[in-house]
Curated annotation (Swiss-Prot):
Protein name as it appears in the record: Putative uncharacterized membrane protein YMR173W-A
Chief location category: membrane
Sequence intervals crossing the membrane: 13-33, 35-55, 73-95, 110-130, 152-172, 179-198, 216-236, 241-261, 267-287, 293-313, 340-360, 372-392
Highest taxon in the source lineage: Eukaryota
Note: Partially overlaps DDR48.
Length: 394
């Protein structure tokens, strides 16, 4: 397998197989596994070259600067700049900000290699991948005044002294399910619950085989002084996954629209176009088929066929994924930011839902700003009832 890195100007790439990977700025990289590309960059920034080290049942990845020798079961990953990595397919991880990853998934095990970009140029992320028999634990850490404490199967705690973001992905694949958790400054959580905070623009796609498919698509943007928290609730049932995102925007942001085209055994992701919006709320619609989950959460999106899903997620996002299988959906979240001004929903299901959308629009016209939160709460409950779900909101 070959990789083609995208580097900055005045960069000289030297790749040597079965040798040593070295990087500039007084840093030496030594990798004792199979392949070792080399990167030299004229400027202070460092571009990472991925090395894919497939073994019999897992694929290891070594992307680095300032990496130390690691055993075969441990991987250290540092991704500071733009990078594109491709490892043949079943699960696709795409980070539209700076990095695009395509990672292969084999049977029960899920190998997930996320990449991070930080607000400052010379901030490095170090990821340690500890694959075990049925799970992969990933613990990245920044190098700027940060203390990272990791407890396997328990809690990931991060303390950052500066206004930098740290993402801690955790992949806990079960027999038929793979869950991904990215966290920043998370608190103690039970083993059956995970919290996902994505402070940068990120798109995740976790594709499952057989009947159950868990798909998490996130596209977020950092707001200057007023970060917005958005809640995504994934409620896996016996043969379906309910994804309920609720979005808020404080300022005119550029949105990424991701179109997921699920086929029988693969998920194709096509991030495209941008939309400028001000204070827009998106209400998703879950369109369940026999073996397929279709989601239509939207603002200003066009009608799509039944096999196409369009998801727009604009802001700081928090994802809670219960690990225990739930047969009964728990409904839509009802927490909406009070500063929302506009609710624009384009739903492609039946006339009933279209009528609900019209009702929501009338609600927003009648009530003033102070009552918008109440309107949205009621609107989502109406959507729940029209879609056949029971709302868990108050």
């Amino acid at each position: 397998m070959t990789t083609t890195p995208t580097t900055t100007t005045h960069m000289v790439l030297i790749t040597t197989i079965h040798m040593v990977l070295t990087t500039m700025i007084h840093m030496a990289l030594t990798t004792m596994i199979h392949m070792a590309p080399t990167t030299m960059i004229h400027m202070a920034l460092t571009t990472m070259i991925p090395t894919v080290l497939p073994t019999r049942r897992r694929a290891l990845m070594v992307l680095t600067m300032t990496i130390r020798t690691a055993p075969a079961t441990t991987m250290t990953l540092t991704v500071p700049t733009t990078m594109t990595l491709t490892v043949p397919t079943t699960m696709t991880l795409t980070v539209p900000t700076m990095t695009t990853l395509t990672v292969r998934q084999t049977r029960i095990r899920a190998l997930t290699v996320p990449t991070m970009t930080i607000l400052m140029a010379l901030t490095m992320m170090i990821h340690m991948v500890l694959p075990t028999r049925r799970r992969v634990l990933m613990v990245p850490a920044t190098t700027i005044r940060m203390v990272l404490t990791t407890m396997i199967h328990m809690v990931l705690t991060t303390m950052i002294h500066m206004a930098l973001t740290t993402m801690i992905p955790t992949v806990l694949p079960t027999r038929r399910r793979a869950l991904m958790v990215l966290t920043m400054t998370i608190r103690t959580a039970p083993a059956t619950t995970m919290t996902l905070t994505v402070p940068t623009m990120t798109t995740l796609t976790v594709r499952q085989t057989r009947i159950r498919a868990l798909t998490v698509l996130l596209a977020t943007m950092i707001l200057t002084d007023l970060p917005i928290t958005t809640t995504l609730t994934v409620l896996p049932t016996r043969r379906r996954v309910l994804m309920v995102p609720t979005m808020t925007i404080l300022m005119a942001l550029t949105m990424m629209i991701h179109m997921v085209l699920p086929t029988r055994r693969r998920v194709l992701m096509v991030p495209a176009t941008t939309i400028r919006m001000v204070l827009t709320t998106m209400i998703p619609t879950v369109l369940l088929t026999k073996r397929r989950v279709l989601m239509v959460p939207t603002t200003m999106i066009h009608t799509a066929p039944a096999t196409t899903m369009t998801l727009t997620v604009p802001t700081m996002t928090t994802l809670t994924v219960p690990l225990i299988e739930t047969r009964t959906p728990m409904g839509l979240p009802t927490t909406v930011h009070p500063t929302m001004m506009t609710l624009m929903v384009h739903l492609i299901e039946a006339v009933v839902i279209n009528t609900v959308v019209t009702t929501i629009t009338k609600f927003l016209d009648v009530f003033d700003k102070k009552n918008i939160l109440l309107c949205l709460d009621l609107s989502m409950k109406i959507l729940c009832m029209s879609c056949g779900y029971v709302s868990a909101g108050k």
